[in-house]
């Protein structure tokens, strides 16, 4: 199956299937156009895939080898340099085409700027958006661009999608006021717990799009990300939430975004790769 806006790149090393036969389909979005602090998100998809080469495909605590699952990797989106809206349009069109060919598949974006999650949500049309992020991303505009990475949750809210945001430790009063007006619940990293997650997500309508901005994790784990923040969550806290979510809710799509860096062995990419394997494993073992 060919796509207008994708190109071949490094792929997972274990056997892959054609997109039409896959349950999970990877798509890289190497976009870095509105990064406001540390550049390098354009290398994210490749760094995550490289990091998977260091991991065993067998997940011990699941007794599951994800190399035996029907996974496809359709490469990376050919981005429009400096234009988050046009690049997100390419993400949207690619996923719309993909869903026509295989409506039961779960697309997984690897990125890449968080701005590109908008294109995925527009294509997959979830009822709810659950995001782990250090930032609220509810600005109306940032650096004169309404499609900046700092605005993605606001643009998604304007689509009528219900939202819940976890791991926050940075935001503006404007964003907090907007969240209050739109009844968007969020949980500060200091107050995060599994019970707090379940309490807010349990009532959300399905299907759910799950987004992980890698900066939600503690900075010691993820030093290479576009807008790093101290004081984040632990790896197993997020995995526990994912396990519950995929068992209780239908998943429309999933992403791991804002992975930056420039070299093999970067701890940020290694964290993202491990999270990718656990997320796929959880969806296979516990998901519907």
From Swiss-Prot:
Disulfide bonds: none annotated. Pathway: Amine and polyamine biosynthesis; spermidine biosynthesis. Optimum temperature is 90 degrees Celsius. InterPro entries: Agmatinase-rel, Ureohydrolase, Ureohydrolase_dom_sf. Mn(2+) 2 binds at residues 133, 135, 213, 215. Mn(2+) 1 binds at residues 114, 133, 137, 213. Its EC number is 3.5.3.24, 3.5.3.11. GO terms for biological process: putrescine biosynthetic process from arginine, via agmatine; spermidine biosynthetic process. It catalyses: N(1)-(3-aminopropyl)agmatine + H2O = urea + spermidine; agmatine + H2O = urea + putrescine. Binds 2 manganese ions per subunit. GO terms for molecular function: agmatinase activity; aminopropylagmatine ureohydrolase activity; hydrolase activity, acting on carbon-nitrogen (but not peptide) bonds, in linear amidines; metal ion binding. Pfam families: Arginase. The record marks 144 as: Important for catalytic activity. One of its GO terms (cellular component) is cytoplasm. Disruption phenotype: Cells lacking this gene show to a decreased growth rate at 85 degrees Celsius and a severe growth defect at 93 degrees Celsius. This mutant accumulates N1-aminopropylagmatine and agmatine at 85 degrees Celsius. SUPFAM superfamilies: Arginase/deacetylase (SSF52768). Belongs to the arginase family. Involved in the biosynthesis of polyamines which are thought to support the growth of thermophilic microorganisms under high-temperature conditions. It seems that long-chain and branched-chain of polyamines effectively stabilize DNA and RNA, respectively. Catalyzes the decarboxylation of N1-(3-aminopropyl)agmatine to yield spermidine and urea. It can also use agmatine to yield putrescine. In T.kodakarensis, two kinds of synthetic pathways from agmatine to spermidine are predicted. One is the pathway via putrescine (pathway I), and the other is that via N1-aminopropylagmatine (pathway II). NCBIfam families: agmatinase. This is N(1)-aminopropylagmatine ureohydrolase. It comes from Thermococcus kodakarensis (strain ATCC BAA-918 / JCM 12380 / KOD1) (Pyrococcus kodakaraensis (strain KOD1)). The lineage of its organism: Archaea, Methanobacteriati, Methanobacteriota, Thermococci, Thermococcales.
């Amino acid at each position: 199956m060919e796509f207008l806006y994708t190109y071949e790149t490094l792929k997972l090393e274990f056997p892959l299937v054609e997109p039409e036969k896959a349950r999970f389909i990877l798509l890289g979005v190497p976009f870095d156009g509105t990064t406001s602090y540390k550049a390098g998100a354009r290398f994210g998809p490749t760094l995550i895939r490289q990091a998977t080469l260091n991991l065993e495909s067998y997940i011990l605590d699941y007794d599951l080898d994800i190399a035996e699952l029907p996974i496809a990797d359709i490469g990376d989106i050919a981005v429009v340099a400096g234009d988050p809206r046009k690049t997100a349009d390419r993400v949207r069109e690619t996923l719309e085409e993909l869903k026509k060919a295989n409506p039961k598949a779960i697309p997984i974006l690897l990125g890449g700027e968080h701005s590109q999650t908008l294109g995925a949500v527009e294509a997959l049309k979830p009822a709810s958006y659950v995001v782990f992020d250090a930032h609220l991303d509810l600005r109306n505009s940032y650096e004169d661009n309404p499609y900046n990475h700092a605005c993605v949750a606001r643009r998604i809210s304007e689509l009528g999608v219900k939202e819940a945001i976890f791991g926050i430790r940075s935001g503006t009063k404007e964003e907090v006021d907007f969240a209050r007006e739109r009844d968007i619940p969020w949980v500060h990293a200091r107050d995060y717990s599994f019970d707090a997650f379940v309490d807010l997500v349990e009532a959300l309508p399905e299907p759910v799009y799950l987004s992980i901005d890698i900066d939600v994790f503690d900075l010691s784990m993820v030093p290479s990300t576009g807008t790093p923040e101290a004081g984040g969550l632990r790896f197993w806290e997020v995995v526990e939430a994912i396990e519950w979510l995929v068992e209780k809710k239908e998943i429309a799509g999933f992403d791991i975004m804002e992975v930056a860096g420039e070299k093999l062995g970067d701890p940020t990419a290694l964290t993202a790769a491990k999270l990718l394997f656990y997320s796929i494993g959880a969806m296979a073992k516990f998901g519907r």
